[in-house]
Amino acid sequence: VAVRMQYTNSTKINSEHLTAESTYTMRHNAFAFGASFVDLEVDVPIGKIKINRVIAIHDSGQILNPALARAQVHGGVAMGIGYALTEQMLFDPETGKMRNDNLLDYKIPTAMDIPQIDVEFVETYEPSAPFGNKALGEPPMIPQAPAIRNAVLHATGVAVYELPLTPERLIHAFIQAGLIQPLSCEHIAET
């Protein structure tokens, strides 16, 4: 719905509402495809992941607005990084209430956490879509967690099967794999 407003010298505003309605029924669902490649470093003793670069490649049909499409992919990559590394809903086991129900405690990535992101599009025409395009809203988020997890596996040889890849989970997996030794209380007392 759009409104055209006409201002006159008086305090009275003349407005005319403009409305339009149209529908388009797709005959079938157009599937978007994407892949991501992640270059990262793992600080094994402290379970810290530093992502250096993400290459995100997407087939979203004909790209109608390249700048907006790139921005959409950047946002999706950032969301995927948060899902893979930090975002986790914690609940109180007795009350069932969410313990991290605010942005101070529920950790989402900031601009400082997002690496260099290179975006490439494979443009294919989708005949069932009105302009030959496909989805580009959520698809860029989806491959990030598997790409990050597989990069950690490639870097360390350790497969982790639960997200997010928090330092606690990584350290536990690295101890189980024998990459690091657990610290004993005696060792801590000596230092």
Q: What do the PLM-derived regions correspond to, one by one?
A:
Residues 1-191:
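C-terminal catalytic domains of large/alpha subunits in multi-subunit enzymes
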